[in-house]
Amino acid sequence: MALMVTRRYLLGGEYPSEEFVQASLEKYFFRQGFDIDTGSYIDLICRDKESRDVVWHIEVKGKTSQPGLDFRTCLGQLVQRMTKDNINYAIAVPRIKQYERLIEETSIL
């Protein structure tokens, strides 16, 4: 069964857009044996097809005109949704200088 990328974005699907990052993650997790859910307020939910116990909630951002604002918004969205200990939570951004700097400036707790 082929994976159908379901979310589309105004800026298109070229790197480093959000659509590119989202599609790349969907393809990766699909190939690793995960069910993909993009139908909720969480950008990407991936659930292991076999065990159903391994779950990822991922917030996705691409290159924007305001990476600082978007990165902090992404962090806030993720933290608000961290409600269960058995879920892996992640942020996915393209590997570009603006996001690398923001990641370096973020405290690790």
Residue ranges and their predicted role:
Residues 1-42, 49-52:
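Acidic-basic catalytic patches of nuclease active cores, encompassing PD-(D/E)XK
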Residues 6, 58-60, 89-92:
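Short beta-strands and strand-loop turn motifs
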Residues 44-46, 54-65, 81:
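Conserved catalytic cores of phosphodiester-cleaving nucleases, focusing on short active-site segments
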Residues 53-54, 86:
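A general structural motif
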Residues 65-75, 99-102:
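Active-site-adjacent loop/helix micro-motif of nuclease/hydrolase catalytic cores
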Residues 73-83:
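Histidine-anchored nucleotide/phosphate-binding helix
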Residues 82-109:
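Nucleic-acid nuclease catalytic cores
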